[in-house]
Amino acid sequence: MVTSEGLASVDSWLYRQGFNVDSWLLSDTFSHDNDLLARALHTTVTAPHTLTPSSAFFDSSAVSHPSSTNTLSSTVSGASDPEIIGGGAKRKRNCLLTDGKAAKRRARASKKSQTTFITADPSNFRQMVQQVTGAKYIDDSSSFGIFDPIVKPEPLRFVNKLPCGPSDRSTAVPMLDTSAFLSNHHQENLAVGNAFSGNSSSVGLPSGKPSATADPGGSAVEFDNYPTFPTLESWKVM
């Protein structure tokens, strides 16, 4: 059983010999370190003074310069000296570019549909419509300007398509009002019957009911009560 009796009588030099350390080295080492620390504190508190040859190395290493401090801090952060210098130069260039000239943005294509506006007064609105729809251009300084005069189209009549002449308008159908002709059909039949009454071979048209007339050969032909229809122009003549 291990006891602690008799440990007080053991000399301390036995432990020092067990670690292979001399007693005179320990005292000198600590005294030298204490001296260096005292001088370093004295140089940081007081003004700089003339360095002695014995403490020149310690003072030069103890006093830190701003450039070396920056270098050490940057090295600890993980970047080398050339990279730090290059990065600072790039930042300065970027600052100068942004301050001197603003970066241009590319123009985006507008998504709005292009709308064409046409200005026209109420006075020349019809001429504007003809121009937009493709009216013919004429070089004339008339009241209509550069456009053809606005003309109402001629109505297409059925009488113009019939093979009859312009004087005989009784074979055409009336265009607008048929009731006027139906009310005066008796006078029309009388006029047509008088025109053909001189010819014996022609057939006379009665004024009332339909009838048949016999020719010398004995043949009979029955005619309708309304054989022809006049046009509007024939009413003026009547």
Swiss-Prot record:
GO MF terms, alphabetically ordered: calmodulin binding
Short sequence motif named VQ, residue ranges: 125-134
Regulation: induction: By cold, salt stress and dehydration.
Domain of life: Eukaryota
One GO process term, biological-process aspect: response to salt stress
Subcellular location per the Swiss-Prot or TrEMBL entry: Nucleus
Signal peptide: none
GO cellular component, one term: nucleus
Record flagged with keyword Nucleus: yes
UniProt biased composition (Polar residues): 68-78
Region (Disordered): 68-87, 201-220
Span(s) of short sequence motif Bipartite nuclear localization signal: 92-108
Keywords on record: Calmodulin-binding, Nucleus, Stress response
InterPro entries from the UniProt entry: VQ (IPR008889), VQ_15/22 (IPR039609)
Tissue: Expressed in leaves, flowers and siliques.
Keyword match Nucleus: yes
Main location, first listed in the record: nucleus
Known role: Calmodulin-binding protein that functions as a negative regulator of osmotic stress tolerance.
Subunit structure: Interacts with calmodulin (CaM). Interacts with WRKY25 and WRKY51.
Protein name per Swiss-Prot or TrEMBL: Calmodulin-binding protein 25
Species this chain originates from: Arabidopsis thaliana
Gene from which the chain derives: CAMBP25
